[in-house]
Amino acid sequence: MKHIDVSTQAPSGISQLVLFKLLDEHWGHAGFLDWLVHIRMEYTQRRDVMLGACEKYLPKEVMSWKPPMAGMFHWLQIEYEKHPDHKNKSVAELEEKIFQTIVDHGALVMKGSWFYADSQAKHDTMFFRSTYAAAPFEKIDEAIKRLGEAIREEFKLNSQ
């Protein structure tokens, strides 16, 4: 059996068999529903920890967000127009500069531009995406604290 035969052309027969066995012979429909309820509760708790950390650590004068209603991602909008260099740099250049400062502070978020449907189009907003899917509560809190420190440094805001 060639790797290409079970990887890129169609869903893997092996993974389909494993999933079938799990759902049909072990969990059943009720077990799958129980798992979905469990993961929903887990994500809700993690989301709430992240939202609490955002309220505590992020500078609202240059950042905004809406609580996620589902899923595992949290989008953070940056008011790049308030950045000291906004008249001299493009949105993409500022996004990269801010992103690098965030990484230098030991936090990791995804640049919003990575998710544009048309990367060549002109964009006049700046977002970063964070996730709360797998990190322990204390790591979420620490990451958002570091994110806030990085944003304050970039925007020359007073420390909290």
Give the residues covered by each predicted segment.
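PLP-dependent class I/II
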Residues: 1-160
